[in-house]
Amino acid sequence: MTLRSTLARVTAKSSYWLLHDVLHRGGTSLPGKLAVSIDPNILTKIQQDFELIIVTGTNGKTLTTALITRVLQAGGYTVITNPSGSNMIQGITGTLVTAKVKPSPNGKKPIAVLEVDEANVEKIAAAMKPKMFVLTNIFRDQLDRYGEIYTTYDKIIAGIKHAPKAVVLANGDSPIFTRGDFTNERKYFGFNHIQPTDYNPTVAPINTDGILSPTDHSVLEYDFITYANLGKYFSTTDSFVRPKLNYQVTSITDLTPKYSTFSIDNTPLRIEIGGLYNIYNALTAFAVGREFNVDPEKIKTAFESNAQIFGRQEALHVDGKDVTIVLIKNPVGTNSVIDMMVTEKDDFSLLALLNANYADGIDTSWICLLYTSDAADD
């Protein structure tokens, strides 16, 4: 460790202590900004302290990262993470340089499970050479920042190419993740909860992105669709089909706004958060846990924790009313929340707030792509 990098770490930790412990503020970005300004190569110099897992994609990063963290901790690993969702270079640097690093009880290196903004994957991967990339999904999102979905995926691929030995664990239900000219080992997770006798071949709804075959750019068809462009797809023009799944949802029992019960690889599980889309997040965490040899029963226990995830379906009690706060930032995420809302059997009031801040996207035209009529009918 050089004098410059030592100074960077001391400065970052001191600023974090001041912001977090004295002023009781978040301290999620400034410590990292100070560290990078003192030593631009600080991440490269501390990479040997951790095994790194990068979690990226459009939707589900924060919850997936939190669930992976719980699962690995249940498996005996020491885990460092960015729970507030501060997922750009400054926030990630701040998380790592201020972390109190201790060896895992199992004698292995601590694992840094980091939610990473898609546009920042290349910077982080180039500096730290991750052990695993976890890819959740790619949907139309913040066009003013990312462009279309294939541009977004190209940014992720650029990061993957910096770490050719890393495993790429991707959502196999998303056709776009079958693309890419990188040489990394690929493993896939997805849904197989519908029996072949119940398949109903169909095409994705109008305006759905990411449904073109990687072989000839024809429009894919589906044996079933879970939501948006996700499902069991196949080409009608050649032999291209969804890749073989290494981990799969094998059944779904209950879908409610407050919890879901389902099975992954025939292991019964429950998560204390609603929505079909959140089963994907749990499936992702299950897959990571199994890749790190965490026993399924320990994963089950980790999922059943009712600890809330910062900013994700937070439940509050205000003036005698139960309030649930749900963050949405793009059409697919919003439509998924609408699907979850219509499973509520009791009457409820809905308040929707829209902002145009940079972090959430200054272009709000995406609200024109919502299917609110379905919710109104219910």
Which residues does each predicted region cover?
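Cys/His-rich short segments
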Residues: Q195-L255
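Gly/charged, well-structured mid-domain segments that form the phosphate/adenylate-handling core
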Residues: L255-P257, G289-T324, I328
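Acidic-glycine-rich active-site phosphate/pyrophosphate-binding loop
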Residues: T65-R70, T253-D265
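Charged helix-capping and loop-helix junction motifs
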Residues: I149-D154, T364-L370
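Conserved small/polar residues in nucleotide/adenosyl-binding loops
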Residues: Y371-D377
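Phosphate-binding loop of NTP-binding sites
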Residues: L3-G190, Q195-N207, L212
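A conserved, hydrophobic alpha-helical segment in the catalytic core
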Residues: A127-N137, L230-P243, I273-E304
